[in-house]
Amino acid sequence: MKYIIVTGGVMSGLGKGITTASVGRNLKNKGYKVTAIKIDPYINIDAGTMSPYQHGEVYVLKDGGEVDLDLGNYERFLDTELTRDHNLTTGKIYQTVIDKERKGEYLGKTVQIIPHITNEIKDRIRRIAAKSGADVCLIEVGGTVGDIESMPFLEAVRQMYREESPENIALLHVTLVPIDSQGDQKTKPTQHSVKELRELGLTPHVIVSRCKKALMESTRSKIALFCDVPVEAVISAHDSADIYEVPLQLENEGLSNYLLKKLILKSTLEDTNWEEMVIRMNNCTGNVNVAIVGKYTHLEDSYISIVESLKHGAIEIGCKFEITWFDAESFDDDPSEVEKLNGFDGILVPGGFGERGTEGKMLAIKYARENNIPYLGLCLGMQLAVIEFARNVVGLDGANSSEFDENTPYPVIDLLPEQEDVVDMGATMRLGDYEATLKAGSLAESIYGASLITERHRHRYEVNPNYVDRIEEHGMIFSGKNKNRMEIAEVPSKDFYFASQFHPEFKSRPGRPSPPFKAFMGAMLKKSKEKKDQ
């Protein structure tokens, strides 16, 4: 097994995740099977109970793992499926070690950071890498070198570096090269970051320098001199117009070839599919405008998979798109604000939890339905679509979800039966892959081109089956079902009205877009052309 460790210095948010994913993509293009592990040094067991404002979107894996959004980038760039084990957290490691201590597995020894915690980290990494069957395992260490939370993980990496053969491990350090008021690129932050890394016993083989513009040769040479790496190992990772251009940029910098040389590997393939996809993306014509009405719109990373899925659909049909974000609470406060949705080619309501903003979202859904604007609802976006339809079309005044109103006279959305006795919040929802059978002749079947699909879920509430017949009598049909569970709602009388209990955005890939997002993008493009022809 070959290991590539990715660390970061100077500050957080430099793009270690995209760098890791891009390195992996380029190695895959060279013919190697790649897997990736994300280390998050927080004490939470997983990301499932975190607010999106803390770390952005909670990404859901096929096995139901609720993980850091970086694993979404790994899956999209590598076109692979990971598991919950691929996200290591301090909480998971400590919980395992404490459980072992309680079982007496340490034979009465004093349990310490070294060797017990570090051994558990190393064992996890090696076990995950071996189980994946990959040729190369990328390991991104979250946080910044110097953070106290990261110390046990960096020590484990140091030990791995000592234990593995030199040709089996490479250390890649991502740093920042800022520009001063005179426009000069400054190397001091990088020098100090590498110095701090060395104090921990780690010497980087490659330095990836994040900067606004391409590194000047003088800057590159200075970093090489003071950080003791070859000039060709100083990589310019300057700002790109789109994250999908980063693998091409790093390839042009010679990074993958340098890593192959370090790891004594040979290129067995030159896959150009990624490059061709980027060319198609940059040659898209036409434009559609989509309104996203959500609860966490102040941080776009809260909906990163949705944005990327829209991009995948747009690339596939060859159009550009622009997103306008709307805070659903603004519609709560002033319902007339919903008129701002006039003129959009499509409206999307994403998932979420809690009552805040739900009435505003339903105003947006109603506006889409009444004005025949293409609508895509995801998870809560489906539940609210059902509530809105029940209130305003079926005539069930006061219909609601029991999540928001326990005393509603018409609980058209209710708690999943298996959730009734659940007390803990973490990892207790209906999570991960579940199948859905699609109704023949429905929009859903035409979108997927199949009668049976598998998608990822994350919810505690569902459409109450006691109201299904009554709702369907008035024109909304449930075209996707998992036994007696409603998975997809659509209104056939509208040009495009599709809402799913699942999250199709988690399975969308560049070059292989999620069917609902591709169809939604197509419906918006059609709407845009119709407006121009009027």
UniProtKB/Swiss-Prot annotation:
* Alphabetical UniProt keywords: ATP-binding, Glutamine amidotransferase, Ligase, Magnesium, Metal-binding, Nucleotide-binding, Pyrimidine biosynthesis
Q: Does the keyword Repeat apply?
A: no
For ATP, which residues are the binding ones?
G13, L14, G15, K16, G17, I18, D70
Description of how activity is regulated: Allosterically activated by GTP, when glutamine is the substrate; GTP has no effect on the reaction when ammonia is the substrate. The allosteric effector GTP functions by stabilizing the protein conformation that binds the tetrahedral intermediate(s) formed during glutamine hydrolysis. Inhibited by the product CTP, via allosteric rather than competitive inhibition.
Gene3D superfamilies in alphabetical order = 3.40.50.880, P-loop containing nucleotide triphosphate hydrolases
Residues noted as binding CTP in the record, renumbered to the chain: S12, D147, I148, E149, K186, T187, K188, P189, T190, Q191, K222
Q: Which InterPro entries match?
A: Class_I_gatase-like, CTP_synthase, CTP_synthase_N, GATASE, GATase1_CTP_Synthase, P-loop_NTPase
Q: State a single Gene Ontology molecular function.
A: CTP synthase activity
Instruction: Please give the biological process terms from Gene Ontology that the record holds.
Output: 'de novo' CTP biosynthetic process; pyrimidine nucleobase biosynthetic process
In Pfam terms, one family for this protein is: GATase
Q: What class of enzyme is it?
A: ligase
NCBIfam families, per database record: PRK05380.1, PyrG
Q: Which PANTHER family match?
A: CTP SYNTHASE, CTP SYNTHASE-RELATED
The record makes one more remark, namely: CTPSs have evolved a hybrid strategy for distinguishing between UTP and CTP. The overlapping regions of the product feedback inhibitory and substrate sites recognize a common feature in both compounds, the triphosphate moiety. To differentiate isosteric substrate and product pyrimidine rings, an additional pocket far from the expected kinase/ligase catalytic site, specifically recognizes the cytosine and ribose portions of the product inhibitor.
Q: What is this protein called?
A: CTP synthase
